[in-house]
Protein backbone atom coordinates (compact mmCIF):
# COMPACT_ATOMS: atom_id res chain seq x y z
CA UNK A 1 0.00 0.00 0.00
CA UNK A 2 2.78 2.43 0.87
CA UNK A 3 4.58 1.92 -2.44
CA UNK A 4 1.34 2.32 -4.38
CA UNK A 5 0.57 5.52 -2.47
CA UNK A 6 3.98 6.99 -3.26
CA UNK A 7 3.72 6.09 -6.94
CA UNK A 8 0.29 7.75 -7.01
CA UNK A 9 1.78 10.91 -5.50
CA UNK A 10 4.58 10.90 -8.04
CA UNK A 11 2.10 10.40 -10.85
CA UNK A 12 -0.02 13.31 -9.68
CA UNK A 13 3.06 15.48 -9.40
CA UNK A 14 4.14 14.68 -12.92
CA UNK A 15 0.61 15.24 -14.20
CA UNK A 16 0.62 18.69 -12.63
CA UNK A 17 3.81 19.56 -14.46
CA UNK A 18 3.23 18.24 -17.98
CA UNK A 19 2.28 19.77 -21.26
CA UNK A 20 -1.32 19.54 -22.43
CA UNK A 21 -0.02 18.84 -25.93
CA UNK A 22 1.30 15.28 -25.85
CA UNK A 23 2.73 15.49 -29.37
CA UNK A 24 4.78 18.65 -29.01
CA UNK A 25 7.08 19.65 -26.17
CA UNK A 26 6.87 23.34 -25.23
CA UNK A 27 9.94 25.49 -25.82
CA UNK A 28 10.49 27.19 -22.47
CA UNK A 29 14.14 28.17 -23.03
CA UNK A 30 16.46 28.25 -26.05
CA UNK A 31 20.16 27.67 -26.78
CA UNK A 32 20.52 25.00 -24.10
CA UNK A 33 24.10 24.09 -23.16
CA UNK A 34 24.46 21.00 -20.96
CA UNK A 35 27.58 20.05 -18.94
CA UNK A 36 30.36 18.32 -20.85
CA UNK A 37 29.56 14.83 -22.06
CA UNK A 38 31.09 12.11 -19.89
CA UNK A 39 30.96 14.16 -16.68
CA UNK A 40 29.77 12.11 -13.71
CA UNK A 41 28.35 14.22 -10.91
CA UNK A 42 28.47 13.23 -7.27
CA UNK A 43 25.16 13.45 -5.37
CA UNK A 44 24.85 17.01 -4.10
CA UNK A 45 27.42 18.39 -6.55
CA UNK A 46 26.38 21.61 -8.30
CA UNK A 47 25.15 21.23 -11.88
CA UNK A 48 24.86 24.31 -14.12
CA UNK A 49 22.87 24.41 -17.35
CA UNK A 50 23.10 27.43 -19.67
CA UNK A 51 20.15 28.63 -21.75
CA UNK A 52 18.22 31.76 -22.65
CA UNK A 53 14.89 32.54 -21.03
CA UNK A 54 14.91 31.11 -17.50
CA UNK A 55 12.27 32.68 -15.27
CA UNK A 56 11.97 33.23 -11.51
CA UNK A 57 9.27 30.58 -11.02
CA UNK A 58 11.10 27.84 -12.93
CA UNK A 59 11.65 24.53 -11.16
CA UNK A 60 13.81 21.49 -11.91
CA UNK A 61 12.49 17.94 -11.87
CA UNK A 62 14.26 14.62 -12.39
CA UNK A 63 13.58 11.45 -14.34
CA UNK A 64 16.17 9.06 -12.85
CA UNK A 65 17.01 5.74 -14.55
CA UNK A 66 19.46 3.01 -13.56
CA UNK A 67 20.17 -0.52 -14.88
CA UNK A 68 18.86 -3.60 -13.08
CA UNK A 69 20.14 -7.17 -13.22
CA UNK A 70 16.66 -8.54 -13.72
CA UNK A 71 15.19 -10.68 -16.50
CA UNK A 72 11.87 -8.83 -16.42
CA UNK A 73 12.71 -5.32 -15.26
CA UNK A 74 15.88 -4.12 -16.93
CA UNK A 75 15.67 -0.59 -15.58
CA UNK A 76 14.84 1.05 -12.30
CA UNK A 77 13.41 4.53 -12.29
CA UNK A 78 12.27 7.38 -10.07
CA UNK A 79 10.21 10.22 -11.47
CA UNK A 80 8.98 13.45 -10.00
CA UNK A 81 11.70 14.44 -7.56
CA UNK A 82 12.28 18.19 -7.52
CA UNK A 83 15.79 19.59 -7.67
CA UNK A 84 17.42 21.80 -5.07
CA UNK A 85 18.10 25.03 -6.98
CA UNK A 86 21.02 27.07 -5.63
CA UNK A 87 21.22 29.85 -8.24
CA UNK A 88 19.09 31.11 -11.10
CA UNK A 89 19.56 33.84 -13.71
CA UNK A 90 17.96 34.59 -17.08
CA UNK A 91 20.74 32.62 -18.79
CA UNK A 92 21.61 29.81 -16.35
CA UNK A 93 20.23 27.58 -13.63
CA UNK A 94 22.29 25.74 -11.00
CA UNK A 95 21.00 22.86 -8.89
CA UNK A 96 22.30 19.94 -6.83
CA UNK A 97 22.67 16.53 -8.46
CA UNK A 98 20.13 14.12 -6.92
CA UNK A 99 21.15 11.69 -4.21
CA UNK A 100 19.87 8.48 -2.59
CA UNK A 101 19.60 6.52 -5.85
CA UNK A 102 21.92 4.03 -7.62
CA UNK A 103 24.35 5.32 -10.26
CA UNK A 104 22.03 6.70 -12.89
CA UNK A 105 21.33 8.55 -16.09
CA UNK A 106 19.14 11.46 -15.03
CA UNK A 107 17.00 13.50 -17.38
CA UNK A 108 16.67 17.15 -16.35
CA UNK A 109 13.18 18.56 -16.78
CA UNK A 110 12.38 22.27 -16.62
CA UNK A 111 8.96 22.86 -15.09
CA UNK A 112 7.06 26.14 -15.50
CA UNK A 113 3.39 26.89 -14.84
CA UNK A 114 2.20 23.36 -15.61
CA UNK A 115 4.47 22.85 -18.63
CA UNK A 116 7.60 20.76 -18.85
CA UNK A 117 10.62 20.76 -21.17
CA UNK A 118 13.52 18.31 -21.26
CA UNK A 119 16.87 20.10 -21.04
CA UNK A 120 19.04 17.01 -21.45
CA UNK A 121 20.63 14.22 -19.44
CA UNK A 122 23.49 13.91 -16.94
CA UNK A 123 25.26 10.99 -15.25
CA UNK A 124 25.10 10.80 -11.45
CA UNK A 125 27.19 8.55 -9.19
CA UNK A 126 25.74 6.13 -6.64
CA UNK A 127 24.11 7.93 -3.71
CA UNK A 128 22.41 5.08 -1.87
CA UNK A 129 22.48 4.81 1.91
CA UNK A 130 24.97 2.28 3.30
CA UNK A 131 23.35 -1.01 4.25
CA UNK A 132 25.27 -1.27 7.52
CA UNK A 133 24.41 0.66 10.67
CA UNK A 134 26.00 4.12 10.71
CA UNK A 135 26.88 6.07 13.86
CA UNK A 136 27.36 9.84 14.02
CA UNK A 137 28.57 12.15 16.76
CA UNK A 138 27.23 15.65 17.38
CA UNK A 139 29.37 18.46 18.79
CA UNK A 140 27.06 21.25 19.92
CA UNK A 141 26.49 23.78 22.70
CA UNK A 142 26.20 20.98 25.27
CA UNK A 143 29.60 19.49 24.40
CA UNK A 144 32.38 20.05 26.90
CA UNK A 145 35.01 20.92 24.31
CA UNK A 146 36.58 23.88 22.52
CA UNK A 147 36.17 22.19 19.15
CA UNK A 148 33.82 23.76 16.55
CA UNK A 149 30.23 22.53 16.44
CA UNK A 150 30.01 19.75 13.86
CA UNK A 151 28.60 16.41 12.75
CA UNK A 152 31.17 13.59 12.64
CA UNK A 153 31.06 10.05 11.28
CA UNK A 154 32.18 7.41 13.79
CA UNK A 155 33.82 4.38 12.18
CA UNK A 156 32.59 1.21 13.89
CA UNK A 157 35.37 -0.98 12.47
CA UNK A 158 38.43 0.98 13.58
CA UNK A 159 39.24 3.98 15.80
CA UNK A 160 38.54 6.73 13.29
CA UNK A 161 36.21 9.72 13.10
CA UNK A 162 35.62 12.00 10.12
CA UNK A 163 34.10 15.48 10.13
CA UNK A 164 31.03 15.56 7.88
CA UNK A 165 29.99 19.19 8.20
CA UNK A 166 30.88 22.13 10.44
CA UNK A 167 28.35 24.60 11.81
CA UNK A 168 28.76 28.38 11.92
CA UNK A 169 29.34 30.17 15.21
CA UNK A 170 25.71 31.22 15.61
CA UNK A 171 24.23 27.80 14.77
CA UNK A 172 23.37 24.80 16.93
CA UNK A 173 22.02 21.30 16.21
CA UNK A 174 20.55 19.18 19.01
CA UNK A 175 18.03 16.43 19.88
CA UNK A 176 19.24 14.65 16.74
CA UNK A 177 17.58 11.47 15.47
CA UNK A 178 18.66 9.13 12.68
CA UNK A 179 15.96 7.24 10.78
CA UNK A 180 17.55 4.03 9.41
CA UNK A 181 17.67 3.97 5.62
CA UNK A 182 17.00 7.69 5.16
CA UNK A 183 20.70 8.63 5.24
CA UNK A 184 19.80 11.89 6.89
CA UNK A 185 19.97 13.37 10.38
CA UNK A 186 17.04 15.34 11.77
CA UNK A 187 17.15 17.57 14.82
CA UNK A 188 16.45 20.93 16.39
CA UNK A 189 18.16 23.67 14.38
CA UNK A 190 18.79 26.76 16.50
CA UNK A 191 19.82 30.08 14.99
CA UNK A 192 19.07 33.61 16.23
CA UNK A 193 17.01 32.09 19.09
CA UNK A 194 14.72 30.31 16.60
CA UNK A 195 14.20 26.57 17.02
CA UNK A 196 13.11 24.91 13.78
CA UNK A 197 13.49 21.53 12.10
CA UNK A 198 16.96 20.97 10.70
CA UNK A 199 17.81 18.08 8.39
CA UNK A 200 21.25 17.24 7.09
CA UNK A 201 21.19 15.13 3.93
CA UNK A 202 24.14 12.74 4.19
CA UNK A 203 23.87 11.62 0.56
CA UNK A 204 23.81 15.12 -0.96
CA UNK A 205 25.70 16.88 1.86
CA UNK A 206 23.44 19.87 2.30
CA UNK A 207 21.15 21.38 4.96
CA UNK A 208 17.39 21.52 4.67
CA UNK A 209 15.81 23.77 7.30
CA UNK A 210 12.04 23.71 7.20
CA UNK A 211 9.09 23.64 9.51
CA UNK A 212 7.48 26.00 11.97
CA UNK A 213 9.16 27.77 14.86
CA UNK A 214 8.73 26.74 18.50
CA UNK A 215 10.16 23.25 17.96
CA UNK A 216 10.69 21.62 21.35
CA UNK A 217 12.28 18.26 20.53
CA UNK A 218 12.42 15.47 17.94
CA UNK A 219 11.61 11.77 17.95
CA UNK A 220 11.30 8.60 15.86
CA UNK A 221 7.85 7.05 15.47
CA UNK A 222 7.12 3.34 15.27
CA UNK A 223 6.03 3.65 11.63
CA UNK A 224 9.57 4.47 10.45
CA UNK A 225 9.00 8.21 10.44
CA UNK A 226 10.41 11.23 12.22
CA UNK A 227 8.26 13.65 14.16
CA UNK A 228 8.71 16.99 15.86
CA UNK A 229 7.08 18.15 19.07
CA UNK A 230 6.08 21.80 18.71
CA UNK A 231 4.64 24.29 21.16
CA UNK A 232 1.51 26.20 20.25
CA UNK A 233 0.20 28.32 23.10
CA UNK A 234 -0.61 26.03 26.02
CA UNK A 235 -0.42 22.87 23.93
CA UNK A 236 2.12 20.53 22.38
CA UNK A 237 1.62 19.38 18.80
CA UNK A 238 3.19 16.29 17.24
CA UNK A 239 3.86 16.66 13.51
CA UNK A 240 5.43 14.22 11.05
CA UNK A 241 8.63 15.54 9.47
CA UNK A 242 9.46 14.69 5.85
CA UNK A 243 12.98 13.20 5.93
CA UNK A 244 13.07 12.92 2.13
CA UNK A 245 13.48 16.57 1.09
CA UNK A 246 15.53 15.52 -1.92
CA UNK A 247 12.36 14.15 -3.53
CA UNK A 248 10.44 17.42 -3.10
CA UNK A 249 7.29 15.29 -3.05
CA UNK A 250 4.15 16.57 -1.40
CA UNK A 251 3.22 14.26 1.45
CA UNK A 252 0.02 15.26 3.25
CA UNK A 253 0.58 15.91 6.95
CA UNK A 254 -1.31 13.82 9.44
CA UNK A 255 -3.66 15.71 11.76
CA UNK A 256 -1.91 17.50 14.60
CA UNK A 257 -1.97 15.78 17.96
CA UNK A 258 -2.71 18.54 20.44
CA UNK A 259 -1.71 17.83 24.06
CA UNK A 260 -2.68 20.34 26.75
CA UNK A 261 0.34 21.17 28.91
CA UNK A 262 -0.21 20.46 32.62
CA UNK A 263 -0.61 23.55 34.74
CA UNK A 264 2.77 25.01 35.65
CA UNK A 265 4.74 23.01 33.04
CA UNK A 266 6.69 24.88 30.39
CA UNK A 267 7.41 23.22 27.05
CA UNK A 268 11.14 23.99 27.21
CA UNK A 269 11.65 21.50 30.07
CA UNK A 270 11.18 18.76 27.44
CA UNK A 271 13.93 20.07 25.14
CA UNK A 272 16.91 18.30 26.75
CA UNK A 273 16.62 14.91 25.00
CA UNK A 274 14.90 13.39 21.95
CA UNK A 275 11.71 11.45 22.67
CA UNK A 276 10.62 8.00 21.47
CA UNK A 277 7.33 6.39 20.51
CA UNK A 278 6.36 2.91 21.67
CA UNK A 279 4.21 0.41 19.78
CA UNK A 280 1.20 1.36 21.90
CA UNK A 281 1.36 4.88 20.45
CA UNK A 282 2.54 6.57 23.62
CA UNK A 283 5.50 8.95 23.41
CA UNK A 284 8.13 8.98 26.16
CA UNK A 285 9.72 12.35 26.93
CA UNK A 286 12.02 13.61 29.66
CA UNK A 287 11.43 16.78 31.68
CA UNK A 288 14.40 18.60 33.21
CA UNK A 289 12.93 20.20 36.31
CA UNK A 290 15.96 22.44 36.80
CA UNK A 291 16.46 21.48 40.43
CA UNK A 292 18.61 18.37 40.02
CA UNK A 293 15.61 16.18 39.19
CA UNK A 294 13.99 14.84 36.04
CA UNK A 295 10.45 13.53 35.51
CA UNK A 296 9.19 10.92 33.04
CA UNK A 297 6.60 12.53 30.76
CA UNK A 298 4.26 10.46 28.59
CA UNK A 299 2.20 11.87 25.73
CA UNK A 300 -0.82 9.60 25.54
CA UNK A 301 -1.18 8.73 21.88
CA UNK A 302 -3.54 5.77 22.23
CA UNK A 303 -6.76 7.79 22.14
CA UNK A 304 -6.51 10.80 19.87
CA UNK A 305 -9.84 12.13 21.15
CA UNK A 306 -8.60 12.25 24.73
CA UNK A 307 -5.02 13.37 24.33
CA UNK A 308 -3.29 13.86 27.64
CA UNK A 309 0.13 14.29 29.23
CA UNK A 310 1.19 12.17 32.19
CA UNK A 311 3.98 13.50 34.42
CA UNK A 312 5.72 11.02 36.70
CA UNK A 313 7.29 11.61 40.08
CA UNK A 314 10.60 13.56 40.05
CA UNK A 315 13.77 11.44 40.05
CA UNK A 316 17.01 12.72 41.56
CA UNK A 317 19.34 12.38 38.57
CA UNK A 318 21.86 14.09 36.31
CA UNK A 319 20.23 12.54 33.22
CA UNK A 320 16.95 10.83 32.29
CA UNK A 321 17.19 9.68 28.67
CA UNK A 322 14.34 7.99 26.76
CA UNK A 323 15.36 4.92 24.71
CA UNK A 324 13.70 2.05 22.89
CA UNK A 325 14.30 -1.63 22.27
CA UNK A 326 12.19 -4.49 20.93
CA UNK A 327 10.74 -7.44 22.81
CA UNK A 328 9.00 -10.60 21.55
CA UNK A 329 5.22 -10.40 21.67
CA UNK A 330 3.97 -12.60 24.49
CA UNK A 331 2.92 -16.03 23.29
CA UNK A 332 4.55 -15.67 19.86
CA UNK A 333 8.15 -16.51 20.69
CA UNK A 334 10.46 -14.65 18.32
CA UNK A 335 7.93 -14.60 15.47
CA UNK A 336 6.80 -11.07 16.26
CA UNK A 337 8.37 -8.18 18.12
CA UNK A 338 6.99 -5.00 19.61
CA UNK A 339 8.76 -1.74 20.41
CA UNK A 340 8.96 -0.87 24.08
CA UNK A 341 10.45 2.19 25.72
CA UNK A 342 12.31 3.06 28.85
CA UNK A 343 14.64 5.52 30.50
CA UNK A 344 18.35 5.62 31.20
CA UNK A 345 18.56 6.93 34.76
CA UNK A 346 21.95 8.43 35.63
CA UNK A 347 22.28 9.46 39.26
CA UNK A 348 25.98 10.30 39.19
CA UNK A 349 29.15 9.74 37.17
CA UNK A 350 30.78 6.73 38.82
CA UNK A 351 30.00 3.79 41.05
CA UNK A 352 30.01 3.83 44.84
CA UNK A 353 30.44 0.96 47.27
CA UNK A 354 27.18 1.85 49.00
CA UNK A 355 24.93 2.65 46.02
CA UNK A 356 26.55 0.71 43.17
CA UNK A 357 26.68 1.90 39.56
CA UNK A 358 25.72 5.43 38.60
CA UNK A 359 23.46 4.53 35.64
CA UNK A 360 20.48 2.19 35.35
CA UNK A 361 18.61 1.05 32.23
CA UNK A 362 14.94 0.62 33.09
CA UNK A 363 11.91 -0.12 30.92
CA UNK A 364 8.71 1.88 31.30
CA UNK A 365 5.62 -0.04 32.46
CA UNK A 366 2.57 1.55 30.76
CA UNK A 367 0.12 -0.28 33.02
CA UNK A 368 1.58 0.89 36.33
CA UNK A 369 3.16 4.07 34.94
CA UNK A 370 6.38 3.26 36.73
CA UNK A 371 9.89 2.12 35.85
CA UNK A 372 10.71 -1.59 35.97
CA UNK A 373 13.80 -2.85 37.74
CA UNK A 374 17.07 -2.25 35.81
CA UNK A 375 17.95 -4.85 33.17
CA UNK A 376 21.55 -3.58 33.13
CA UNK A 377 23.70 -0.93 34.80
CA UNK A 378 26.89 1.02 34.10
CA UNK A 379 29.26 2.89 36.38
CA UNK A 380 29.43 6.18 34.45
CA UNK A 381 26.71 8.76 33.73
CA UNK A 382 25.05 8.52 30.31
CA UNK A 383 24.76 11.40 27.83
CA UNK A 384 23.06 9.91 24.77
CA UNK A 385 21.92 6.62 23.23
CA UNK A 386 21.32 5.09 19.78
CA UNK A 387 19.49 1.80 19.15
CA UNK A 388 20.43 -0.79 16.53
CA UNK A 389 17.94 -3.54 15.66
CA UNK A 390 18.66 -5.49 12.47
CA UNK A 391 15.83 -6.48 10.12
CA UNK A 392 16.09 -10.13 11.18
CA UNK A 393 16.31 -9.14 14.88
CA UNK A 394 19.53 -11.14 15.25
CA UNK A 395 21.43 -8.01 16.19
CA UNK A 396 20.05 -5.81 18.96
CA UNK A 397 22.40 -3.28 20.51
CA UNK A 398 22.44 -0.03 22.46
CA UNK A 399 25.23 2.42 21.63
CA UNK A 400 25.64 4.64 24.68
CA UNK A 401 27.73 7.79 25.12
CA UNK A 402 29.03 8.05 28.70
CA UNK A 403 30.86 10.71 30.65
CA UNK A 404 34.50 9.79 31.25
CA UNK A 405 36.75 10.61 34.15
CA UNK A 406 39.23 12.34 31.84
CA UNK A 407 40.14 12.74 28.15
CA UNK A 408 36.61 13.15 26.84
CA UNK A 409 33.67 10.78 26.73
CA UNK A 410 33.28 7.04 26.15
CA UNK A 411 31.09 4.97 23.84
CA UNK A 412 30.10 1.49 24.99
CA UNK A 413 27.91 -1.03 23.19
CA UNK A 414 25.40 -3.15 25.10
CA UNK A 415 24.42 -6.41 23.38
CA UNK A 416 20.78 -6.94 24.33
CA UNK A 417 20.82 -10.60 23.29
CA UNK A 418 24.02 -11.49 25.15
CA UNK A 419 23.57 -9.08 28.04
CA UNK A 420 27.15 -7.81 27.84
CA UNK A 421 29.02 -4.48 27.51
CA UNK A 422 31.94 -3.76 25.17
CA UNK A 423 33.93 -0.58 24.57
CA UNK A 424 33.71 0.82 21.04
CA UNK A 425 37.17 2.43 21.18
CA UNK A 426 39.59 1.69 24.02
CA UNK A 427 40.35 4.91 25.85
CA UNK A 428 37.40 6.87 24.48
CA UNK A 429 38.16 10.56 24.11
CA UNK A 430 34.99 11.54 22.22
CA UNK A 431 33.99 15.24 22.25
CA UNK A 432 30.30 14.64 21.55
CA UNK A 433 27.20 15.48 23.54
CA UNK A 434 25.00 13.26 21.36
CA UNK A 435 25.29 10.17 19.18
Predicted regions and their residues:
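Structural motif
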Residues: 143-153, 192-199, 234-248, 290-298, ...
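Blade-level signature of beta-propeller repeat domains, shared across WD40, Kelch, NHL, RCC1
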Residues: 403-435
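Beta-strand/beta-sandwich contexts
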Residues: 18-59, 68-79, 115-129
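Repeated scaffold domains used in trafficking and secretory/extracellular systems
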Residues: 169-182, 212-233, 262-279, 312-337, ...
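An edge-strand/N-cap motif at the start of beta-rich repeat modules
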Residues: 77-82, 86, 122-165
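C-terminal motif of bacterial Sec signal peptides marking the signal peptidase cleavage site
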Residues: 13-16
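Short loop/turn segments that connect beta-strands within beta-propeller blades
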Residues: 156-159, 201-205, 241-243, 251-254, ...
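A short beta-strand motif characteristic of beta-propeller blades
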Residues: 160-168, 205-212, 216, 248-267, ...
Amino acid sequence: MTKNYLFLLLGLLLAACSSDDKDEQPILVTNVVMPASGTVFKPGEKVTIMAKGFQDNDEIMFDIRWPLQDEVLHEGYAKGGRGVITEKTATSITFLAPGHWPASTTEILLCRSGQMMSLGKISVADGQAPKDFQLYGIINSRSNTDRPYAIEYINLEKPQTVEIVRLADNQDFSCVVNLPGSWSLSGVWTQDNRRTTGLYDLSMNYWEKTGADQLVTMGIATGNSVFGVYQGGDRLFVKTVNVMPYTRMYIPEKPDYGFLLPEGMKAEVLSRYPCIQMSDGNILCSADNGDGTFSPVVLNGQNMEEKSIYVGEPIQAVALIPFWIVKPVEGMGTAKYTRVGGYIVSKRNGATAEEGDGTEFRLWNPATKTLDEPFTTFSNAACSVATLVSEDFKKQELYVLFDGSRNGRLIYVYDLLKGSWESLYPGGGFPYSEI
